Amino acid sequence: MTGLFPDNPKSPIDLLALEGQALRRGFFRIAGIDEAGRGPLAGPVVAAAVILPPGLLLPGVNDSKQLTEEKREELFDVIHREALAVGVGIGDHALVDRINILQATLSAMRDAVRALSMTPGFLLIDGISNIPMNIPQRTVKKGDSLSLSIASASIIAKVTRDRMMVEYDAQYPGYGFASHKGYGAASHLAAIAELGPCPIHRKTFSGVKEHLPSQPDCDTAGPSTGLFSF
């Protein structure tokens, strides 16, 4: 259950340490930021920003990669219900190819913060790169296993992206997007070799660019970024 007194408080309390440090420094509305989809060969990079009520514990919330799909889906709903604000930003395949994956990730993170229904006073960011915004912030290596806010953002980003890839699987059959979500699985690489890249493949990525025709005839139309506020 959620609340201030979980059955096993050690892990959730540890995950509030970074938020507690920011609160003691006088910052409020602390947003955790994380992304999903930096490594895949296809599809967008998705970032999420989550502001939780101070002191809220969410037992079970951890790095999304350590959770089952069923658990992520369950916690996705819990986070939306308990959070003060949730924002999502999307950098599509075309943006990734145009400005590189790091810059597309930072752009998606910035969009996620802008999509929040309230302005955060402090950002806790998974990774080592600051977001180009005039908001006090701190980067945290492996932050999705150290901060409840970042872990919550990790789950929102992962579930959002996975759902998008399931939709792409129906739109572009034969690649198996619903199963591997665009990552470089052997079955995915084999499909690219057989079918060639489809419109959502990242054409600057190894594993894809080797199979491009000399004059690509792929439609990269569509918005490069997206803002979604919950």
Curated annotation (Swiss-Prot):
Family membership, please give it.
Answer: Belongs to the RNase HII family.
Q: What are the record keywords, sorted?
A: Cytoplasm, Endonuclease, Hydrolase, Manganese, Metal-binding, Nuclease
Give the main localization category.
cytoplasm
Positions that bind a divalent metal cation: 34-35, 126
| Name of the featured protein | Ribonuclease HII
Instruction: Tell me which EC number(s) this protein carries.
Output: 3.1.26.4
Q: How is the cofactor bound?
A: Manganese or magnesium. Binds 1 divalent metal ion per monomer in the absence of substrate. May bind a second metal ion after substrate binding.
Q: Which HAMAP family match?
A: RNase_HII_B
Ranges in a coiled coil: none
* Subcellular location, record wording: Cytoplasm
Molecular function per GO: manganese ion binding; RNA binding; RNA-DNA hybrid ribonuclease activity
Q: Which cofactor does it need?
A: Mn(2+); Mg(2+)
Query: Reaction catalysed?
Result: Endonucleolytic cleavage to 5'-phosphomonoester
